[in-house]
Amino acid sequence: MTKYETVIGLEVHVQLDTKSKMFCRCSTDYASAEPNTHVCPVCLGMPGVLPTINKQAVEYTIMSGLALGCDIAPFTKFDRKNYAYPDLMKGYQISQYDQPLCGKGFLDINVDGVIRRIGITRIHLEEDVAKLHHESDINGQPYSLLDINRSSIPLMEVVSEPDMRTPEEARQYLMKLRTIMRYLGVSTANMEEGSFRCDANISIRPVGATELGAKVEVKNMNSFKAVFSALEYEEVRQRKMADEGKKISQETRGWQDEKCQTVSQRSKEFAHDYRYFPEPDLPPLHISCDWIEDIRAKLPELPETRKERFINGYWLSEYDASLLTASRELADYFEAVLGETDFQNIPQDKGVKEVANWVVGSVNSIMNTGGADITAFALKVSPASLCHLLVLVSAGKVNAATAKAVLEDMYATGQNAEAIIEKKGLSQISDSSELVAIAKKVLADNPKAVAEYNEGKTQVIGFLVGQMMKQSKGRANPNIAMELLKKALEEG
């Protein structure tokens, strides 16, 4: 049994998906723009200019706070965070220090079937910094270029309590938080693109102790896997140092993905190192109860609530419901297909399960193979088109295996199912006379399997059905094929 307990807290920076920057009207579409084109005197930090607060960013932060059960402050203000770094255009960052927009909240995560409640310390608003590009000249000498397009993009920082005890809990927390941000529509929350960034604070202490150990901040993690690996590495490193009687320094370390290790970058700063003071160019904000309730009324159904509805209302398993609600767009697509479905000829629970199987299985498989999301998929295969394909399967016009290939063609070409089936001659063969001829040939070609069946090894019927499917190029109705084979074998 381990002597140490790991303590992890996360600071997550979420780029808000607003059209303009936090304190000016410059566009936030910096990713596809030429460097240093979406700039103005305000985000350049020129003397004498005055910032103005982006109302949409404030509303997005309140919305996020409500979704995470936070207390929304009736009074909040901005502060100057002072530090020297080349990507900080003003020489300070406009942030929030002692009076953040959102206070205490929580996020529940499920790890191996156990629900863990992770506390949220605060959520505050600030501006992003410019982006440094590190290059080398023809002689191998390093130099850096500065792209100011990202400077002053609205940034929301979600700070957790140090409530996580394993790297896996940290990963689950991040994944759940990202899903909520995407459901709310406040951010694309893409780690690889930098719109969802995480710094982790990790320490160890003897099991049973209540006082926190020396805190190490880990940076430069741009994927969920990197966060997990960095924390796992740091956990092992710190425990080894403690076992060897070495002092663990409070410092900032960077994750090196290619070497799978953390390296020391600098000593960890304290709040007083930043010399915070109130931002003199921005008035405090008074958040009225009416404003909060207006925003609350706009909240969408959140993933956990939607998952419970799918389980209780659609009779889905927790596994299927979790997969379907992992993305708001995927859940919307699933419900849109259901809305097109006529359950008159089949039990509703069976029909819902069939739709869920197709969306979770075949649709997800096509998206993963093609690197597309459900929005792109729906442009080629609308909910009505998928529903029509399932109707053809239910009516026996095409079998399930062939239908999966048809769905792939529908996505590739944008054509409807019937056109593809007719063009490629994929209609299911349900005519008994035609299938009897195929069955006779299969039995004649496989005397060993016939002998095994007659000896009581009835499981070989599956092999024989497979041979009929092969002979018919996947068009044989598998249920009728099995009946005909059994009848022929019983009759000898």
UniProtKB/Swiss-Prot annotation:
BP-aspect Gene Ontology terms: glutaminyl-tRNAGln biosynthesis via transamidation; translation
Principal EC category: ligase
Keywords (A to Z) from UniProt: ATP-binding, Ligase, Nucleotide-binding, Protein biosynthesis
PROSITE patterns: GATB (PS01234)
Record-linked SUPFAM superfamilies: GatB/YqeY motif, Glutamine synthetase/guanido kinase
Family annotation (Gene3D superfamilies): 1.10.10.410, GatB domain, N-terminal subdomain
UniProt GO molecular function: asparaginyl-tRNA synthase (glutamine-hydrolyzing) activity; ATP binding; glutaminyl-tRNA synthase (glutamine-hydrolyzing) activity
Reaction equations catalysed: L-glutamyl-tRNA(Gln) + L-glutamine + ATP + H2O = L-glutaminyl-tRNA(Gln) + L-glutamate + ADP + phosphate + H(+); L-aspartyl-tRNA(Asn) + L-glutamine + ATP + H2O = L-asparaginyl-tRNA(Asn) + L-glutamate + ADP + phosphate + 2 H(+)
Pfam families xref list: GatB_N, GatB_Yqey
EC code: 6.3.5.-
InterPro entries: Asn/Gln-tRNA_amidoTrfase_suB/E (IPR017959), Asn/Gln-tRNA_Trfase_suB/E_cat (IPR006075), Asn/Gln_amidotransferase (IPR018027), Asn/Gln_tRNA_amidoTrase-B-like (IPR003789), GatB (IPR004413), GatB_C_1 (IPR042114), GatB_Yqey_C_2 (IPR023168), Gln-tRNA_amidoTrfase_suB_CS (IPR017958)
NCBIfam families: gatB, PRK05477.1-2, PRK05477.1-4
Family per record: Belongs to the GatB/GatE family. GatB subfamily.
Function noted in UniProt: Allows the formation of correctly charged Asn-tRNA(Asn) or Gln-tRNA(Gln) through the transamidation of misacylated Asp-tRNA(Asn) or Glu-tRNA(Gln) in organisms which lack either or both of asparaginyl-tRNA or glutaminyl-tRNA synthetases. The reaction takes place in the presence of glutamine and ATP through an activated phospho-Asp-tRNA(Asn) or phospho-Glu-tRNA(Gln).
Binding partners and assembly: Heterotrimer of A, B and C subunits.
PANTHER family with a match to the protein in the record: GLUTAMYL-TRNA GLN AMIDOTRANSFERASE SUBUNIT B MITOCHONDRIAL AND PROKARYOTIC PET112-RELATED (PTHR11659), GLUTAMYL-TRNA(GLN) AMIDOTRANSFERASE SUBUNIT B, MITOCHONDRIAL (PTHR11659:SF0)
Protein's UniProt name: Aspartyl/glutamyl-tRNA(Asn/Gln) amidotransferase subunit B
